[in-house]
Amino acid sequence: MKEIISRHKAGEQIGICSVCSAHPLVIESALRFDLNSGNKVLIEATSNQVNQFGGYTGMKPADFRDFVYGIAQEVGFPRERLILGGDHLGPNCWQNEPADTAMEKSVELIKAYVAAGFSKIHLDASMSCADDPTPLDPMVVAKRAALLCQAAETTATDEQKRHLTYVIGTEVPVPGGEASAINAVHVTREQDAARTLQTHQAAFRALGLDEALNRVIAIVVQPGVEFDHTQIIHYQPQAAQALSAWIKETPMVYEAHSTDYQTRQAYRALVRDHYAILKVGPALTFALREAIFALAQMENELISPEQRSRVLEVIDEVMLNEPGYWKKYYRPTWSQAMVDIHFSLSDRIRYYWPHPRIRQSVEKLIANLNNVTLPLGLISQFMPVQFERLSEGVLTPTPHNLIIDKIQDVLRAYRFGCTPDVA
């Protein structure tokens, strides 16, 4: 990370896409995409996804590291080009507990991530706990972030400290996209970014963490990008010019969250304006979902009814029987909720792919289509971009390859934004 930031600060318009997903096909897509490019690949886990208690994936930080390393080994991707990051590390998971208890757990969370070899650490203590006022005083946020940083510094070996980097601050939207409809988004004011930096510097120095301040590479801000279930707010460079100008005077860059679904030109403009770390998550699993839905349509055309996977029906059954991951986010009317379940840009289907019934049905779908030849006309009908790539000779028409390539469509837009010489 330090090399990428140094090059950006030296005047190169380069950035890095942060892949925020625990889905094996998404991780495989990212590693295959940059297998021969020489680029570093940044893969991040969030605190609710992966923590010392297992998170919703059931993985602790060391488990997630081994999970990613296992995929890298299968792909042939060298570990030295992998950067592992932890996102929103702090009391996020324990906001309903008293602050002292939540912070004790947060310290252990940080230690577990650093001990497992994660080198990009987002110190985020911005959320109020059960006995806190709302919102938290910025100095309290900074002091808690400093305590988390201290835990990282005491855990890291000298070798790890060579690569260890920190991100401070938080964005306006909730982690994972907006829960309700959006009409506009508040762009972070430069004075608020400056205050974030100043309060963190003071809090770090109060704990003797002067050296650690040199490892702070980025501040999380809101440059004016967001999405909800049906809408996207696109980047408007003119609205963020003061914010962009301020960061030039520091040794840092910005990190932008919720950049999913922006245009490739927007990504290039964001990187130009020093939002050099671009987070993406739901857009990648949305592309995965599109690919599986497309393959299900092909299956309906090619496979006899009694042999089909019924993957779309299985998804509906599971999500309706177990609505915990979507009920409070989607519209209450039945017909509207079904549209959201299938097609919402926030893509809450992503929480259900590991479900045993859904996983088995996806495996059957892929097995069924592996046993037949996929007609080019059918691929053109349901995956037209992949049809073009087949015609160009850069893609072989297997179900697995079609899924991977569909996910990589998202990564192509980020590559355009993060790499100035890509046309």
From Swiss-Prot:
Keywords: Galactitol metabolism. Pfam families: GatZ_KbaZ-like. One of its GO terms (biological process) is galactitol metabolic process. InterPro entries: Aldolase_TIM, GatZ/KbaZ-like, GatZ_KbaZ_carbometab, TagBP_ald_GatZ. The keyword RNA-binding does not apply. GO terms for cellular component: plasma membrane. Pathway: Carbohydrate metabolism; D-tagatose 6-phosphate degradation; D-glyceraldehyde 3-phosphate and glycerone phosphate from D-tagatose 6-phosphate: step 2/2. Belongs to the GatZ/KbaZ family. GatZ subfamily. HAMAP family: Tagatose_aldol_GatZ. Forms a complex with GatY. NCBIfam families: agaZ_gatZ (TIGR02810), PRK15052.1 (NF011626). Component of the tagatose-1,6-bisphosphate aldolase GatYZ that is required for full activity and stability of the Y subunit. Could have a chaperone-like function for the proper and stable folding of GatY. When expressed alone, GatZ does not show any aldolase activity. Is involved in the catabolism of galactitol. This is D-tagatose-1,6-bisphosphate aldolase subunit GatZ. It comes from Salmonella enteritidis PT4 (strain P125109). The lineage of its organism: Bacteria, Pseudomonadati, Pseudomonadota, Gammaproteobacteria, Enterobacterales.
